Every structure is written in structure tokens, then in C-alpha cells.
């Protein structure tokens, strides 16, 4: 696979995904302003991984948050989610070269937001007496997203899927951190949740552009197997945030009611 031309946005995306140092993941160089002319399709199979990150096939479950250790473990998982999201936004810049340049530029902006969120989490992990690398992580997003065949499938899974579910997860974890007496940690969750709305709105806008609408079945069938709506929602749905992010009420009703065919009572 031919590497992108130096000094281009595509090269920045390539280098970010491929980087193997923690510093390069947390503080990449400024994004160039020049796009490559007629870029080819490039699908990187896996990201570079700093030695600090210990990748496992099955992540440890987030359990009690009453201890600093438990909250640090949870935040470490969230930081790795943000890293994968940043990498996959950069990955998509390379994987969908024929997509509108406005769309690809938006992916870069979101990647930079995710990197900033990583810094927020890293600071909180340090406050709790831990560091990046103290806990194992799983590249779960990377196990799923690269199978997206086109930009519509990508935003269905990322913007309207994982990032949408984070509207619920950040709300839930903010409450749990607050219950544990960690007001600072709760506020960070709330901040990231508020900023996630724009990312979901970006996904909704471009899914409508690519597929001509935002109905539930069109979205569900765009998800790459084996992903399903079950993984793309928290309980209860944060309807107000999702509405602000461009998800209409009929979509939310269908998402709330959906269950796999093989569940009892379905």
C-alpha cells in the first residue's frame, strides 16, 4: 500500500493511526491544510500500539466505583475508547477517499476532539493515583469498524452507534461518580457527554446525506455485522440529547423498543 504524500492531511491520518508511541497518540503534530490529489483507497488493518497499552482479547468488566482504583480503571477504559475513536476517524479519512471533502474534514475535527478527551481522562486517571498502562485494554472498536464497506455504514456504527450510546453512558457514569463522592470525575463525564452531541449530529447529518433519510430500519441494516442496536443504546435513552443530535422521535421509539429476534418474548 502506497503511503500518503508528506505534508498532506492523509499523511497526518496515516501517521496517527500507525504511531507506536504514547506521545504521538496524545499529542500528534498539527494537521496540515493540504489534501492529497486523487488519493487511492487505503484500509489500514490495525493501529500502531504503544508498549504502555496492554491489549487483551477480553476486557475486565468495570465494577465498583467507590474506590479510586475502580474509578481509575473505568476512566482508563473510557480513554482507550476515545483513542480508538480518534484512530478510526483518521482511518476513515484514508478508507473513503471518494467521500466529500467536507465529510472527511469533519472526521479530522472529531478526531482532534477525541484526542482532547483523552487528555481529560489522562488527567483524571493521574488524579486518582494511576497512569495510562496500569490496566489492560481491548481494541473492541477496531474489531468491528474496519468492516464498514462505505461512509454510510461507518457513521451508522460510529456516530449513530457508539457515540450515541455514549450520551447514555456518560450520563450514567456521571451519576455513579457523584454517588461515589467524586464530583470532579462526574463533571468530566458530563462535559464529554455534552461535546458528544455534536459528534452524533455530524453522524446523523451525513447518514441522511448518504442514505436519504434517518429512519430506524435504514440505519439498522447499515450496521456492519454482528453489530446490532442492542449495543448502540444505554438505559434509559437520553432522549433530549439524542433529539438535539438530530435523531427524530420515531427513530428513538424504534430504538427503545428493539430487541433481538432470539430473545424470549420477542
Annotate each predicted stretch with a short phrase:
Residues 1-266:
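Non-heme di-metal
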Amino acid at each position: 500500500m502506497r503511503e500518503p504524500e508528506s505534508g498532506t492531511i492523509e499523511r497526518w491520518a496515516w501517521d496517527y493511526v500507525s504511531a507506536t508511541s504514547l506521545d504521538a497518540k496524545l499529542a500528534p503534530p498539527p494537521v496540515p491544510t493540504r489534501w492529497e490529489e486523487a488519493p487511492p483507497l487505503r484500509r489500514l488493518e490495525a493501529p500502531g500500539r504503544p508498549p504502555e497499552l496492554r491489549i487483551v482479547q477480553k476486557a475486565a468488566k468495570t465494577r465498583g466505583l467507590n474506590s479510586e482504583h475502580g474509578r481509575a480503571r473505568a476512566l482508563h477504559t473510557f480513554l482507550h475508547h476515545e483513542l480508538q475513536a480518534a484512530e478510526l476517524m483518521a482511518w476513515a479519512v484514508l478508507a473513503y477517499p471518494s467521500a466529500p471533502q467536507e465529510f472527511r474534514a469533519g472526521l479530522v475535527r472529531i478526531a482532534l476532539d477525541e484526542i482532547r478527551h483523552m487528555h481529560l481522562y489522562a488527567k483524571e486517571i493521574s488524579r486518582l493515583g494511576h497512569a495510562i498502562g496500569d490496566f489492560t485494554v481491548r481494541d473492541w472498536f477496531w474489531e468491528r469498524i474496519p468492516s464498514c464497506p462505505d461512509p454510510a455504514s461507518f457513521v451508522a456504527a460510529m456516530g449513530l452507534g457508539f457515540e450515541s450510546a455514549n450520551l447514555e453512558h456518560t450520563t450514567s457514569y456521571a451519576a455513579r461518580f457523584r454517588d461515589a463522592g467524586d464530583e470532579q470525575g462526574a463533571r468530566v463525564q458530563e462535559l464529554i457527554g455534552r461535546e458528544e452531541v455534536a459528534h452524533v449530529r455530524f453522524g446523523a447529518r451525513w447518514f441522511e446525506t448518504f442514505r436519504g433519510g434517518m429512519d430506524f430500519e435504514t440505519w439498522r441494516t447499515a450496521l456492519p455485522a454482528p453489530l446490532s442496536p442492542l449495543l448502540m443504546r444505554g438505559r434509559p435513552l437520553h432522549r433530549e440529547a439524542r433529539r438535539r443530535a438530530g435523531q427524530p422521535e420515531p427513530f428513538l421509539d424504534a430504538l427503545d423498543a428493539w430487541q433481538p429476534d432470539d430473545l424470549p418474548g420477542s
